[in-house]
Amino acid sequence: MISAGEVLKVIKERIENFDGQVKCESVGEVISVKDGIALVYGLEKAKFGEVVAFANGTIGVVLNLDCDTVSIVIFGSENSVGEGDIVKCTNQLMDVPVGLELLGRVVDALGNPIDGLENFDTKTRLPVEIKAPGIIDRQSVTEPLQTGIKVIDMLIPIGRGQRELIIGDRKTGKTAIAIDTIINQKSHNNEVIDKEKVYCIYVAIGQKNSSVARIINKLRESGALEYTIVVVAGASDSASLQYLAPYTACAMGEFFRDNGMHCLIVYDDLSKHAAAYRQMSLLLRRPPGREAYPGDVFFLHSRLLERAAKMSDKKGGGSLTALPIIETQAGDVSAYVPTNVISITDGQIFLESEIFYKGLRPAVNVGLSVSRVGSSAQIKSVKKVAGSIKLSLAQYRELEDFAKFGSDVDVHSQKILDRGRRMMELLKQKQYSPLSVGEQVAVIFAGTSGYLDDISVNDISKFEERLLSELNSNYPDILSSISNNNFTDDIRSLLSKVISKIASSLK
């Protein structure tokens, strides 16, 4: 028989060990799950954009708030969430791991590694949705970001902190330009301290896994993966993860920007991102608008791209440069999403199928492409030769259309046409073969100065190969002087002699 003393002792222990703190949780119950959207009853204190946790550990984000229910987008497999499951509010916003530890890694839209390597230990996490820097915190674009592609660096220059859209039909070389730009940063990064390096982030949205694997292998082969983060939300991933991926990557890029470093981010592509958001919005029963997109599809991309900026010196002087990619249908740039992104960005690089099939690669339409702020970031040695090439090509395009209607062309016009054809040939460039600033200036200088006028158009590529080989082997000082913005009269005359010597051997 239990004595009264023992009972009192147990009661006393229970009272002493009682934790008086009351733990309050906002809890709801899943009513239905379909197409990646969970309808939950309860969660009265849930906030828009708040992360919630399901019973099995899967997370989601609140995107609709109704009287008695909330609609939650599930980040993960919907098969693991069932009717009647308990859902808890976390009182947190969506955040992802950021930092230098992620360089060289492949992660998913939640920041989890998917490359089969060990987990990374990052102490820093940043919210995926954050307000873009204000006007006072920014400064104008003043430093160039070299792509290594002649036609872009000379005619459509990109500066650090700029948003430059790459737009064109499928299979016109949009991704190739972005990957070439990432690979080109290797030579720059090898010459500067860590603070001045350009770190890169490539975001694959709705891409085939085979295509993404090919890009990762190319980055690894060229030694570019060591300063690059690859974020993947493939075609087999849910619409919610494809929607989240660009914001995840942008948060990772902001780590570099806000710590006084430089970062380049490629969104490939925002057309599929908009389609994923359209799918989510329709499933959330939001009213459709033009082309069935929701009314806030402009805000979807503007709040993402406005986070790319060149920060003021007070804020560390870091930069985040964005290269969003848009895929058009049959060259229609007046569609809803393309016009939205064109109006948000600081310029666009138009790629055309017709130019591509003519064999002009990269297939950039120089007449329609523009960079609104990048020209102020060009170095002087580039500006000296870039101005004359713009004029030459403008005159060539005008006369080319005119010459189609008649065979009789005066001597002056014929001279412009001949030089224009050689300049177009000179702007051709093979994929994965970026050129340094010095090499680009030397090649374009040869064309604009008339040294190629007597060379056959078919021999232009041969001339370029010989010139670059000669300069790299015997005159590296010329290339380094031009790259260091030191294109003096002495350098110009020495370069002219080298060009004349090679040109005369091909006449």
Swiss-Prot record:
Sequence positions that bind ATP: G168, D169, R170, K171, T172, G173, K174, T175
Primary subcellular site in the record, as a coarse category: membrane
GO molecular function: ADP binding; ATP binding; proton-transporting ATP synthase activity, rotational mechanism
Top-level enzyme category: translocase
Membrane topology: Peripheral membrane protein
CC per GO annotation: plasma membrane; proton-transporting ATP synthase complex
Reactions this protein catalyses: ATP + H2O + 4 H(+)(in) = ADP + phosphate + 5 H(+)(out)
UniProtKB keywords: ATP synthesis, ATP-binding, Cell inner membrane, Cell membrane, CF(1), Hydrogen ion transport, Ion transport, Membrane, Nucleotide-binding, Translocase, Transport
Presence of the UniProt keyword Transmembrane in the record: no
Function per UniProt: Produces ATP from ADP in the presence of a proton gradient across the membrane. The alpha chain is a regulatory subunit.
UniProt cross-references to HAMAP family, sorted A to Z: ATP_synth_alpha_bact
Family label: Belongs to the ATPase alpha/beta chains family.
Oligomeric form and interacting partners: F-type ATPases have 2 components, CF(1) - the catalytic core - and CF(0) - the membrane proton channel. CF(1) has five subunits: alpha(3), beta(3), gamma(1), delta(1), epsilon(1). CF(0) has three main subunits: a(1), b(2) and c(9-12). The alpha and beta chains form an alternating ring which encloses part of the gamma chain. CF(1) is attached to CF(0) by a central stalk formed by the gamma and epsilon chains, while a peripheral stalk is formed by the delta and b chains.
Name this protein carries in UniProt: ATP synthase subunit alpha
Organism, scientific name: Ehrlichia ruminantium (strain Gardel)
Gene: atpA
